[in-house]
Regions:
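Catalytic phosphate/metal-binding cores of nucleic-acid and nucleotide-processing enzymes, i.e., regions
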Residues: 1-101
Length: 101
């Protein structure tokens, strides 16, 4: 499966549950290697995703850097590919976050 088709399917499924997926583009002030997508849940949870076409797809050094940096700051950042997508989906759907005002 092509990465864009895989990513589109996840986006479509999550948007049906009220999520917002924002595509981050490196040439718009987003640093090189920063995750592809910001995922916002309807309950206030947010995470970053770097989509990969397979578990063996190369992760660039800056992608690894940003994934580690974001996680160390308390944000959730993931490398997601077809082989781990179900685990990722379960983790996101189970997040017990609620909206705070």
């Amino acid at each position: 499966m092509l990465e864009r088709n895989f990513k589109s399917k996840q986006k479509e499924d999550f948007e049906k549950m009220g999520w917002i997926f924002i595509q981050l583009v490196a040439d718009s002030g987003v640093p090189m290697g920063f995750p592809d997508t910001l995922c916002l849940s309807p309950t206030g949870y947010a995470c970053y995703v770097e989509w990969k076409k397979s578990k063996d797809a190369k992760k660039q050094p800056l992608q690894r850097y940003w994934n580690k940096k974001l996680n160390s700051m308390g944000h959730d950042a993931f490398f997601v590919y077809p082989e781990n997508v179900e685990e990722w989906r379960r983790e996101l759907i189970s997040k017990p976050r609620t909206i705070s005002h």
